[in-house]
């Protein structure tokens, strides 16, 4: 149920006329009273009439975007797809970037966009089911479209087929006779990362492959680098690395190179995203490609369709595909681990006089 003037007035302990004066920016309100009203508005998630009337009387033709840090390649490419599609359809865009994934941060971001009188909002950030439902209920006057929510969440959303992509990655490495896997996932709050990791686990178990180690990364290259450096320092042997995005895979390749481990002869590495730069990694990265631009564009089309003809909840899943490059190859009997080489050298030393 939508929050009303009366709800705000009741919580703040003032009249509805006072609430009206505060929301209209009138000067003849005591600061203590103004603070109580604004605190009540914030707590209840109330949208002042001025914004609500603007939304109902005439469209501003502005689409709001709530986003993660746009220094992340995937996030930035999705936002770019949203902007491009919006502009082609005669809409402007307004962007706000989250400091974290808390419910309060999402609420503040949405209120900031409402203040700019946006027509609807696309949430370009991971949201759990509870927060998604809360936002839909609290901001019921707005059309919200999500991009990273758990499967089965009753909200409008668009996503790529993370499950199929993760399956393709494991099967590709299994076909290359790899059997000792390291998994580097994304942040635990990301639904996309969880789907990928769960699919990896299912396929590894199905084919009898070993998960040697698992690390949780943060989508940045440095976290992939740290994971591999830790494994090398511990002397742990592995022959394949599944990475939840291409940026972390860049860090993986760098760490393996620093350790003198050959890719793909000794260790095969596969990423996820298919960002354009991945073809220029050393070696060029095998990856699961998802179309970020199309994802952003689809979100805009779904949103506008729901604005014009609100009805049943829509969920769209976009396909992905495997792009094979030089970071993966078939394991051969001539490949040796670091531990095997050290053992061989030790045996030779013992035979010497």
Name each model feature, range by range.
Residues 169-209, 213-214, 314-330:
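An alpha-beta-alpha
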Residues 123-168, 247, 273-285:
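Flexible loop/hinge segments that line or gate small-molecule binding clefts
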Residues 120-121, 126-133, 182, 194-276, ...:
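Hydrophobic alpha-helical
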Residues 156-183, 201, 221-230, 249, ...:
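Hydrophobic alpha-helical segments within soluble ligand-binding/sensing domains
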Residues 47-112, 117-120, 198:
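Amphipathic helical "hinge" segments at domain boundaries
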Residues 232-353:
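Flexible loop/turn connectors
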Residues 1-60, 350-353:
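N-terminal helix-turn-helix DNA-binding module of bacterial transcription factors
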Residues 36, 73-91, 165-169, 191-210, ...:
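Short, solvent-exposed amphipathic alpha-helices that sit
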């Amino acid at each position: 149920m939508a929050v009303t003037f009366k709800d705000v007035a009741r919580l703040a302990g003032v009249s509805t006329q006072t609430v009206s004066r505060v929301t209209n920016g009138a000067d003849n309100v005591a600061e203590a009273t103004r603070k109580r009203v604004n605190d009540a508005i914030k707590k209840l998630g109330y949208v002042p009439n001025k914004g609500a009337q603007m939304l109902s009387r005439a469209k501003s033709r502005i689409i709001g975007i709530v986003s993660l840090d746009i220094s992340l390649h995937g996030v930035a490419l999705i936002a770019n797809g949203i902007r491009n599609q919006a502009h082609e359809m005669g809409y402007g865009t307004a962007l706000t970037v989250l400091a974290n994934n808390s419910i309060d941060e999402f609420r503040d971001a949405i209120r900031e966009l409402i203040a700019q009188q946006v027509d609807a909002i696309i949430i370009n950030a991971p949201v759990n089911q509870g927060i998604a439902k809360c936002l839909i209920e609290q901001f019921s006057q707005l059309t919200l479209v999500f991009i990273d929510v758990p499967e089965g969440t009753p909200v409008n959303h668009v996503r790529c087929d993370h499950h199929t992509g993760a399956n393709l990655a494991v099967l590709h490495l299994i076909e290359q006779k790899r059997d000792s896997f390291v998994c580097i996932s994304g942040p635990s709050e990301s639904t996309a990362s969880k789907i990928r990791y769960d699919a990896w686990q299912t396929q590894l178990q199905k084919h009898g492959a070993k998960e040697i180690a698992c690390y949780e990364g943060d989508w940045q290259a440095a976290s992939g680098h740290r994971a591999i450096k830790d494994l090398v320092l511990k002397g742990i042997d592995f022959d394949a690395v599944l990475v939840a995005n291409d940026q972390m895979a860049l860090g993986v390749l760098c760490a393996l190179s620093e350790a003198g481990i050959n890719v793909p002869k000794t260790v095969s590495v596969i990423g996820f995203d298919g960002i354009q730069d991945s073809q220029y990694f050393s070696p060029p990265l095998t990856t699961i490609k998802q179309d970020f631009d199309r994802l952003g564009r689809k979100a805009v089309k779904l949103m506008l369709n729901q604005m014009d003809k609100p009805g049943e909840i829509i969920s769209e899943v976009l396909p992905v595909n495997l792009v094979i490059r030089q970071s993966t190859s078939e394991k051969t009997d001539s490949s040796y681990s670091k531990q095997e080489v050290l053992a061989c050298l030790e045996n030779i030393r013992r035979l010497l006089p």
